């Protein structure tokens, strides 16, 4: 990016920062005045139903095993087959199918393991009806989706402040999240785009909410209480999304995702329902995906 574009970018960052800052302040003050942030007492699922560290570690191990072992192994097998049979590299669409197989197997494996380990615990992690006036699963999902209007401006404001700091300290630097690059790669192939949308809009929110809120946050809550558990699980969630390819953008990404994850953790505790945090996560990813597909270049 040349020097002529620098003032324009600086102005855009300032304008966005002010806009999201005002929205975040006004909307969250209104929500606070209406009692939205009052949590009240919530049951310790991990303590009552025996959620242990070994189960949390196993669930994360299942996820990482598929991501770090299964995907590279299957990719190498397919590449070797094409090299031997056709003397060429496999079409890129094969790797989209690998992605679909992987995320599907991950969700199925997590469910089967958790259900076999303790079906009652799984039931209460997904939806705890022991809280006062529990709503329906659909109601929880919609509640979480609607809370996007509170969480998104805060995350966007923090991201813009971080971008401004990066601009002032290190100069102009553009970056893209790994998931954004993945989505843009699929735009020109309907099949690949459908697989990407399934991964980003359904598989990722369901899997990540189960792992970070349902498992990790529930276990941490037993050890340190609700608020520290939300903060710690949110920090783990943010760090989980870092990548060397994002450069200094990792700073902005980590801070904005941390604030967003705190909303996810709070919504999970407030509604005692994973459907609520999934609703918020799905909405966040859906709006972000819509913006990338229709309002960005490249």
Feature names for model-found ranges:
Residues 1-145, 286-298:
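N-terminal, membrane-interfacial amphipathic/helix-forming hydrophobic leader that caps
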Residues 2-28, 153-161, 173-298:
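Transmembrane helix-loop-helix hairpins at the membrane interface
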Residues 79-88, 127-131, 166-175, 220-227:
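Membrane interface segments of multi-pass transport proteins and intramembrane proteases
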Residues 68-69, 149-150, 201-202:
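Hydrophobic alpha-helical transmembrane segments of integral membrane proteins
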Residues 138-154, 217:
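Interfacial segments of alpha-helical transmembrane regions
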Residues 90-94, 143, 147, 164, ...:
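Short alpha-helical transmembrane interface motifs in multi-pass membrane proteins
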Residues 60-63, 92, 108-110, 121, ...:
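Generic intrinsically disordered, low-complexity segments enriched for polar/acidic and small residues
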Residues 66-76, 154-166:
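C-terminal TM-helix exit segments that contain a strictly Trp-centered aromatic cap at the helix terminus
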């Amino acid at each position: 990016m040349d020097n002529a574009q620098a003032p324009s970018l600086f102005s855009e960052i300032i304008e966005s920062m002010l806009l999201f800052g005002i929205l975040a302040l006004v909307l969250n003050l209104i929500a606070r005045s209406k009692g939205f942030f009052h949590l009240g007492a919530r049951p310790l699922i991990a303590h009552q139903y025996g959620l242990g560290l070994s189960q949390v570690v196993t669930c994360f191990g299942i996820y990482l095993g598929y991501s770090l072992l299964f995907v590279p192994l299957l990719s190498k097998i397919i590449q070797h087959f094409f090299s031997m049979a056709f003397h060429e590299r496999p079409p890129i669409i094969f790797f989209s199918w690998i992605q679909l197989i992987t995320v599907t197997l991950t969700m199925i494996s997590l469910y089967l393991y958790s259900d076999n380990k303790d079906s009652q615990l799984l039931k209460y992690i997904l939806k705890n009806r022991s809280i006062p006036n529990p709503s329906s699963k659909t109601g929880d999902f919609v509640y979480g989706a609607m809370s996007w209007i509170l969480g998104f401006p805060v995350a966007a404001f923090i991201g813009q402040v971080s971008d401004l700091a990066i601009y002032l300290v290190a100069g102009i630097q553009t970056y893209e999240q790994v998931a954004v690059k993945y989505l843009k790669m699929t735009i020109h192939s309907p099949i690949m785009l459908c697989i990407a949308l399934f991964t980003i809009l359904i598989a990722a929110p369901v899997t990540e909410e189960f792992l970070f809120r349902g498992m990790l946050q529930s276990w941490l809550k037993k050890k340190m209480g609700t608020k520290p558990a939300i903060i710690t699980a949110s920090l783990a969630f943010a760090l989980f999304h870092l990548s060397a390819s994002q450069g200094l953008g990792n700073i902005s990404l980590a801070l904005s995702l941390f604030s967003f994850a705190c909303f996810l953790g709070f919504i999970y505790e407030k509604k005692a329902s994973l459907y609520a945090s999934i609703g918020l996560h799905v909405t966040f990813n859906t709006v972000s995906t819509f913006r990338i597909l229709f309002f960005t270049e490249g």
